[in-house]
Amino acid sequence: MKNVILTLDTETADLSGNVYDLGYIIHDKDGNQLTSYNALVSEIFTQPKIMMGAFYAKKLFSHYAPMLDNSEITMRPWQEIIDQLRADIVEFNVTTIAAYNIGFDMRAMSNTHKSLTGESRVLQSKIKVLDIWQFACEAKLRSLPKGLSEVRLNERSY
């Protein structure tokens, strides 16, 4: 079976979830892009009280407004975004979802989904997940000279 990866990124308005920007690229293991998607969550992005707490609040007008004007990003209801995500997973036979800190992204998506729909499951079936951050750390440790990785790990233990 061909390995097809959906590399995901979310931006949240706060630590409890409230995803306001969800984007992904679907590609093969060699990086050949099959499709991409990026949307602002209308239920969150249009709420000033929520959005002022966002890490990137200063970029709302300098970053997102021009993207909306240039049709580089769309604003959609959460359910429509999730429906598109699910449809793309099926259409492109996605085998793995990857993100830099996938635990955060999946938790934020789950919290947002539950808050906006009352449902607890974002994805409809089990799928492999890859934490790019963890993968990079493990790859770096494997590249160290034999024995050095253990020494460095022991130096940092407390």
Label each PLM-derived region with a short phrase.
Residues K2-M106:
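Conserved non-catalytic scaffold segment of RNase H-like nuclease domains
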Residues G103-L130:
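Substrate-recognition/cap helix-loop segment adjacent to the acidic, metal-dependent catalytic center
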Residues T95, E119-V122, R142:
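Short coil/loop linkers at secondary-structure junctions
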